[in-house]
Amino acid sequence: MNYLAGDIRAQLPARFNQQQKAREELAWCAANAEKAPNRGYLREVYYQQAKLAQAANEPEKAQEYLRLSGYRDLNRPLAFNTAFAEDTATGHTFVPRRISEPVPGRVYALSGFEFTEYYFVVSDDGRELIGIDAGTRPDSAKGAYEALRAYAPGVPALTTVFVTHAHWDHVGGFSFLSSLNPRPRFYARSNYEEELTRSLNAPPAFEKNFFGERFDMADVRRFKPDVTVDRPTELRVGGTRVSLIPIPGGETSDGLFIHLPDAGILFAGDFIMPYLGAPFIEEGNFQGLLDTIDIVTRLNPRLLLHGHEPLTRVFTSPVMLAQLKTDLAWLRDQVQTAIRRGDERALIHQANLIPPELLASHPDAQFGYLLLREHVIDRLYDQSIGYWQADLQGVEHLSRADHAESPGRLFRRLGGTTHQSSRTDDGRREV
């Protein structure tokens, strides 16, 4: 309530005399930041404080509030109160930096240090530290590891790292973690090289947008585990029982669950990343996703920890995933029927496909379905058709330069003549 009241009062014209009340409410918000859904809400608080200070002829305060808001000036076109952030050098983060303890004193989750999550587990005997995944870049892995040791100086040395899959953001920090003394032992799925090759051959246009200018594909190329796993494997690390479970999908072909059965914890990696595989490379296994959900429900973990903070927040429990599986199977049937009917992809999206039982299901399953729907349609469509699509995409090969041409010039170059093309009253061209 204070957030909305302060934000609205700060924007009212001066004749309403609400500036002081706005200052008080915004100051309360800044002082009680831990009560906000996420720290992204403070951006608008600081921005409105900056505008109030500027109007009160307090330029130094205005500049400080503006700096805290993250905006460049006092003319921002849109208000952002999201948890995520973008940085040219370090890339995307889903949430502000924080360290939490899903199991106090035993399991540490490091969020917001880069694109992916870091997890560390203190072994049952207290003598070894277990890591889950290696992060995106050596510098971010170093920052996260040092932050953990500053936060919990009594944790033991890192001895073991289990890698859930060989995507860029889960192996790119390998060179830092492998440089520690003593050197940790790395475990991965036996077919990790297949996924690594797929990642290394991906178009380069996207990687730095996600992972920042500091990202270097050479860091991904350096990844080489000490032990590979091709079947369900159980071992003990410092007395902690660990089950390594190869999974059939759905993001990558080399997925590996890290299960701590005695603690009821499952480190799930990115098996249910909404894109169903990175959207800019050919991967993703929808049936594998459904089969992997069955594995989760069979294991029935008390804690389900994913490779990215929003996944942990959204895909929360085996019960929710079981409901989601039913909804996704229905969606696949609808998409496949539409493809056989010859519908173009845009029409399938516009159909607003909603399972009959969705509205009666748990709200968590509703949100999860809506989050996945667009990308499941895209992936299934991509994997079900050839290079000639129903809307004739792929029949003609147009470059960016072609798209930049005027319609008439492009029409003539593709074989049309001037008498074949005419302009209607509303400006459209008809043949």
For the regions a language model picked out, list residue spans one by one.
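Active-site HxH/HxHxD metal-binding segment of metal-dependent hydrolases
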Residues: 149-234, 255
